């Protein structure tokens, strides 16, 4: 073993092996073999020396090193060919820059699309899009179709990167924004590129028409093949132009641009079937090179950017297959169409629900970013037109109808009251914008961020209660029959509870909880959070009704005509009903888990370094920053859920019966909801079988078996179907 004792400034000999270096450089080398072996003998068998400089990062790098699946550098050892860059490949004649045949164009375009998608899925540009040599310098390309396509792909990458960076809802596992010094076609305007693509498209369309079969004419197979290939190339060029135009539309501030994007997405969707049916027309990648994970074909070199990659081992990039590419684009188009719908939503609550539902599909980083930038445009206005403060006021009006925001109330034009409410609303803007942004992150990061934002909502809750008290005092002096108690506080509490519920439920989706933890998670949800949520919703509904009564009395005083009373649908009634169903599902699961535990069907770990209390406190740690509702500590939970306080204490069969009643109650509540959506039908698919299983267990079915039950979360992410094994 040889160690360098002095650093040589001359780095020219990097590629030489050690003995040659020793001969050619003036560096003095010291043999440390014996010293190293002596030091090793001091360690016992199995002992390791842990240097303080060797942390988790270095440990992970050591694990990844030389593993072909994790160390991208290993790919170089598997190939014997010479790696050429664009200019070298052109000089060598291994790639064409003019007169590309249609199969070559189609194959290169398809592989470029695959690389683009692999980049959007979190890999680096150097390992994906820039493995296409044509993208390196489109100015050199003489073929008009290839040149326009290369510029189009660069522009798509550039605008997508800008959108994702601006939305800031990505983490290192989602997206790599580095461009490695490549030119992103900044010297050419977006309009010029779309114009070039349109010219190529028109030229292709003329060729498609000229090769089309005419009635009564015998078809030449070669002409038919050319027609199919022209159509395939035309579809791909048009798809590139449409996708680029959609991204350009999203950079405009006008809401009309979203409508334009919607129309273009319909066009893009229509082109996909033509792309799918013509995949076989393109040249295919050679087999047996670099394990087939990265296509080797004319114009592509997976190792060309190997030296640009960072010194830490980058992820091994596996380029997706062409068939998957079409499916991915199809899903992306559907997601972008969904993004366009957000501008039609009337209020902040609907927008928050929309963001939650959109996030549940685990969308890609590009569609998540487009949704964020569509919601809050550069000028910090919602959809580029509404002030966030006005959205907050509308949300308050629709939820609790606070007197201070009613034009018929004396406080509406009171300067002091106006200052109070305006200050509160301004303080609401940041937490609510952050909440919307959180729903743009991937599901795992969302949960972490929801835990942190609770602190901001706790501060807001405190302010809301103070503002409520001040406004109530002002109101009593002028309109004693009216109240302004807990209006703003109720609204903030509602959002805090929703965040807390979402935080706990997402743990099931992310598979964070062990089976033995289910019972206290479901207990906290059913006995505490959903109970608080229903009480909050009922209080908000009561505030709305009280305000409506006052408005009706004022109307009666002015008008002598009798008005027919219509039965009004309460705005919050559906949410109250859904909360009751969720509460029953959680209560049913809690009692099921307790009964399973009593029957010895829940495997518990032998706690050595932690305990149930430690785990419980870890699970609910983010709730400690919230004062309302007050957090339930472990000892409180044990006391409240203790069955021995009942006389006689319930046995497993009684608990199974109680659980079955909860599932039945949830089923009845959900079946009473008109116009049931997908969420309702999903919960019903869990409630019905669970009701039957609980009945069987209550009757003594598989009583002697100690085999743990199975929990199937495939139907619903938060409530499993219980299966007896």
Swiss-Prot record:
Q: In which tissues is it expressed?
A: Expressed in primary spermatocytes, basal epidermis, interstitial fibroblasts of skeletal muscle, and intestinal crypts.
- Record has Protein biosynthesis as a keyword: no
Name the Gene Ontology biological process terms: negative regulation of apoptotic process; smooth muscle cell proliferation
Q: Under what conditions is it induced?
A: In carotid arteries, after mechanic injury.
- Which Gene Ontology cellular component terms are annotated? cytoplasm; NatC complex
For the keyword Cytoplasm, the answer is yes
Give the keywords, sorted: Cytoplasm
Alphabetical list of PANTHER family matching this protein: GLUCOSE REPRESSIBLE PROTEIN MAK10, N-ALPHA-ACETYLTRANSFERASE 35, NATC AUXILIARY SUBUNIT
Function per UniProt: Auxillary component of the N-terminal acetyltransferase C (NatC) complex which catalyzes acetylation of N-terminal methionine residues. N-terminal acetylation protects proteins from ubiquitination and degradation by the N-end rule pathway. Involved in regulation of apoptosis and proliferation of smooth muscle cells.
Q: What protein name is recorded for this chain?
A: N-alpha-acetyltransferase 35, NatC auxiliary subunit
Recorded name of the encoding gene: Naa35
């Amino acid at each position: 073993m040889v160690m360098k004792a002095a650093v040589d400034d001359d780095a020219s000999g990097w590629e030489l092996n050690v003995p040659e270096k020793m001969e050619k450089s003036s560096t003095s080398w010291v043999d440390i073999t014996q010293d190293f072996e002596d030091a090793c003998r001091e360690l016992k068998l199995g002992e390791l020396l842990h240097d303080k400089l060797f942390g988790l990062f270095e440990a992970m790098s050591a694990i990844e090193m030389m593993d072909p699946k994790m160390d991208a550098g290993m790919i170089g050892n598997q190939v014997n060919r010479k790696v050429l860059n664009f200019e070298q490949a052109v000089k060598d004649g291994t790639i064409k820059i003019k007169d590309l045949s249609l199969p070559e164009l189609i194959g290169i375009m398809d592989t470029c699309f695959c690389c683009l998608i692999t980049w959007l899925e979190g890999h680096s540009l150097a390992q994906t899009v820039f493995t296409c040599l044509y993208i390196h310098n489109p100015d050199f390309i003489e073929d008009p179709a290839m040149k326009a396509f290369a510029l189009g792909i660069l522009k798509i990458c550039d605008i997508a990167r800008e959108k994702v960076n601006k939305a800031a809802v990505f983490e290192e596992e989602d997206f790599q924004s580095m461009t490695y010094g490549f030119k992103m076609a900044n010297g050419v305007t977006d309009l010029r590129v779309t114009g070039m693509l349109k010219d190529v498209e028109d030229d292709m369309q003329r060729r498609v028409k000229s090769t089309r079969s005419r009635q009564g004419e015998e078809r030449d197979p070669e002409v038919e093949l050319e027609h199919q290939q022209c159509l395939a190339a035309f579809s791909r060029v048009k798809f590139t132009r449409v996708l680029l135009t959609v991204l350009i539309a999203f950079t405009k501030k006008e809401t009309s641009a979203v409508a334009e994007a919607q129309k273009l997405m319909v066009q893009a969707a229509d082109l996909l079937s033509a792309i799918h049916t013509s995949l076989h027309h393109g040249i295919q990648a050679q087999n047996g090179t670099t394990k087939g994970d990265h296509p080797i074909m004319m114009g592509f070199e997976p190792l060309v950017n190997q030296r640009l990659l960072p010194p830490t081992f980058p992820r091994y990039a596996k380029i997706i297959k062409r068939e998957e590419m079409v499916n991915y684009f199809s899903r992306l188009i559907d997601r972008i169409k969904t993004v366009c719908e957000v501008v039609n939503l009337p209020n902040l609550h609907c927008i928050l629900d929309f963001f939650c539902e959109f996030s549940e599909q685990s969308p890609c980083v590009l569609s998540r970013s487009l949704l964020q930038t569509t919601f809050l445009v550069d000028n910090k206005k919602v959809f580029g037109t509404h002030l966030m403060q006005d959205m907050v006021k509308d949300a308050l009006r629709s939820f609790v109808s606070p007197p201070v925001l009613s034009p018929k109330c004396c406080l509406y034009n009171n300067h002091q009251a106006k200052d109070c409410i305006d200050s509160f609303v301004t303080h609401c803007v940041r937490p609510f914008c952050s909440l919307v942004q959180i729903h743009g992150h991937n599901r795992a990061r969302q949960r972490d961020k929801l835990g942190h934002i609770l602190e901001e909502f706790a501060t807001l809750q405190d302010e809301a209660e103070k503002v409520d008290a001040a406004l109530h005092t002002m109101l009593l002096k002028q309109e004693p029959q009216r109240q302004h108690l807990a209006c703003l506080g109720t609204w903030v509490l509602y959002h805090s509870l929703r965040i807390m519920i979402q935080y706990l439920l997402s743990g099931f989706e992310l598979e964070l909880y062990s089976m033995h933890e289910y019972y206290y998670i479901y207990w906290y949800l059913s006995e505490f959070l959903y109970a608080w949520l229903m009480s909050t919703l009922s209080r908000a509904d009561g505030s709305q009704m009280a305000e409506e009564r006052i408005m009706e009395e004022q109307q009666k005083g002015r008008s002598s005509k009798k008005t027919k009373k219509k039965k009004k649908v309460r705005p919050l009634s559906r949410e109250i009903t859904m909360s009751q169903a969720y509460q029953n599902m959680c209560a049913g699961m809690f009692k099921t888990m307790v009964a399973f535990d009593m029957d010895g069907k829940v495997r518990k770990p032998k706690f050595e370094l932690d305990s149930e209390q430690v785990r419980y406190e870890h699970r609910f740690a983010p709730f400690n920053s919230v004062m309302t509702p007050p957090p339930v500590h472990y000892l409180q939970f044990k006391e409240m859920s203790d069955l021995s306080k009942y006389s006689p204490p319930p046995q497993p069969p009684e608990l199974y019966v109680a659980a079955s009643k909860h599932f039945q109650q949830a089923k009845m509540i959900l079946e009473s909801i008109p116009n049931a959506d997908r969420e309702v039908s999903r919960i019903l698919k869990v409630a019905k079988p669970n009701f039957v299983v609980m009945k069987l267990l209550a009757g003594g079915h598989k009583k002697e078996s100690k085999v743990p039950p199975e929990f199937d979360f495939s139907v619903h992410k938060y409530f499993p179907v219980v299966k007896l094994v």
